């Protein structure tokens, strides 16, 4: 049976388990990477470096929730449209999602670059680690234009009923990130850790967007495919979630 249609036919429980288990394992793999990343930085560098990464990561969460909102909105649109949309309609939807996502990613990166030092001061980052935290954060933000389409593509593929491919890619990029951490953190410090993460995001984005293009689209991109009605739907579903998550993080961080 075609995996992307298996949730719509046959017994519900086995199909749901086959779909949900890879998602759970994806979350486990992501958490394992986060722990491994912290351990490598803690073992290879000093306490100040680890504190700088921790402070930068707290601020970066504000920008990452923008990505999370786009993921949720994109996944909902794809899952809602998949059962009835034609291949060409799905192609248009996916291109519009990726286009809007990339524009938002570039804008978010620019805002992050400018506001990062002020946001770090706002959370009382110690002066002695401020420059290191800014360095880590800005290198990490350079990967955001790849992280956002990577995350969105994973969510769109899952919205089409395939949760195994995103799991495989998450495991592969996590392993790549850890290996690059081991290679780069020692000689380059927190900059190496951020560069390792950005490189893994680039690799994940390239693979997932190519996979989405190969399996779910029937035409090359054309500017004529961009339509305002898709943009309205994207913002309608994505913006409230992004604002809700980001505002909660801002309030918790500042307080």
Q: Which residue ranges define each predicted feature?
A:
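Membrane-embedded alpha-helical segments of multi-pass transporters/permeases
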Residues: 35, 39, 66, 106-117, ...
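Interhelical loop/hinge segments that connect adjacent transmembrane helices in multipass membrane
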Residues: 1-20, 197, 209-249
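Small-residue-rich hydrophobic transmembrane alpha-helices
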Residues: 50-110, 147-166
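Interfacial/gating helices of multi-pass transporter permease domains
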Residues: 41-61, 127-132, 191, 195, ...
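Helix-terminus/linker motif at the lipid-water interface of multi-pass membrane proteins
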Residues: 32-51, 120-127, 183-188, 246-255
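Alpha-helical transmembrane segments of multi-pass membrane proteins
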Residues: 127-150
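Transmembrane helical elements of multi-pass membrane transporters/channels
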Residues: 18-37, 139, 173, 200-204, ...
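Membrane-interface helix-loop junctions in multi-pass transport and translocation proteins
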Residues: 174-206
